[in-house]
Amino acid sequence: MFGYVVVNEQNSIVFLDGNEEFKTIFQSLIQSEITSRKSDLDSASSGVGSSTCTEEQESSLDHFKKPNVVFNSSEISHILLPLILLYRSTSEKTKDPITEMSSQFGTISISKFYHNYLVLVFANDDRKRIEVSQTIEHTIATLFGPLIAFCHTDLTTVKKPKEHLACALTRKLSYSPKC
């Protein structure tokens, strides 16, 4: 799995991409979150539980379909918010931020740059994680500079830098280390 997320100082996602495995894993996390919320609401609303047999059949069919994942940044930020807040609170409280964290999906590296923006890189390969993190930081600083606060908008002055950043990171995503 390999992917990256760039978060601004308001904890909103401004850039996000990854390989198919990354997209599929996050899509399944979103689906499980939605399903668990729905079942919580169903069971709490009337006191009468409902059968989930049809939902299970539908979800098992989804595994056989080719994933066409479109990310909704608010859904992803909902999943990543605890990790982001843990990083920010630890770095404020102890002045010794968490830089890497292991999960069942691989290692997550977190780095802070330019006006409290965070870069989260998800990958199993250490070299790839460091390389992509540095590429993101340098490319954003070079392309956006003081306009970084506007990178999530559709202003004409940030459209080209956003396209260039997407191209540079797509090249990094398609790179596979030689064994």
Curated annotation (Swiss-Prot):
Organism: Caenorhabditis elegans
Region of interest (Disordered), residue spans: 40-59
Protein name: Gut granule loss protein 3
Chain intervals with Polar residues compositional bias: 42-54
